[in-house]
């Protein structure tokens, strides 16, 4: 995104100097939390502009994003394939996914395979849709967003994978008992 497009994306109800100061604070807070997951500030700011809700005033968006600056930064860095960000996301947010999946009615036997499918859906995407992490907009914490994404997805594996080798073996055993 060029500088003019970036400027237009953020121009509505905040003075230029206030906007610049707010964006600098966002970038500084994010870099402080995830120093190894380096992302160009212009890339981060451009992605923040894309995460404004339809009709959301700039001042409100900046306040919301300030509350979740570090989480937004991590999500954007993951979306852009920054290895340190992906490792941090795995450690900080995906560790609880298998436990969460085991609590779902259909998740007890499929937790490990489903957790890998969730990771792929969040960080890689598929042919029809890019990585879901790109949809995180800072309306609440990233951990909560991950939990909601897991539960709404009901831990279904991506199309065409059928849950991996373990799931295929379980289905084969179930058919044999049928």
Question: What role is predicted for each listed range?
Answer:
Residues 1-178:
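Intrinsic, short, N-terminal disordered tails of RNA polymerase sigma-factor systems
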């Amino acid at each position: 995104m060029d500088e003019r497009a970036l400027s237009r994306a953020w121009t509505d109800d905040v003075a230029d100097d206030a906007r610049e100061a707010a964006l600098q604070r966002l970038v500084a807070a994010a870099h402080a939390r995830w120093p190894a997951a380096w992302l160009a500030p212009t890339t981060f700011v451009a992605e923040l502009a894309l995460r404004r809700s339809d009709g959301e005033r700039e001042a409100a968006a900046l306040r919301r994003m300030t509350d979740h600056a570090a989480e937004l930064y991590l999500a954007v860095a993951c979306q852009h394939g920054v290895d340190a960000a992906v490792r941090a996301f795995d450690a900080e947010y995906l560790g609880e996914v298998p436990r969460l999946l085991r609590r779902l009615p259909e998740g007890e036997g499929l937790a490990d395979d489903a957790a890998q499918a969730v990771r792929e859906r969040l960080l890689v995407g598929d042919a029809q849709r890019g990585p879901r992490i790109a949809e995180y907009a800072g309306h609440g914490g990233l951990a909560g967003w991950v939990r909601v994404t897991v539960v709404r997805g009901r831990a279904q594996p991506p199309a065409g994978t059928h849950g991996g080798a373990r799931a295929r073996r379980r289905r084969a055993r179930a058919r044999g008992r049928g």
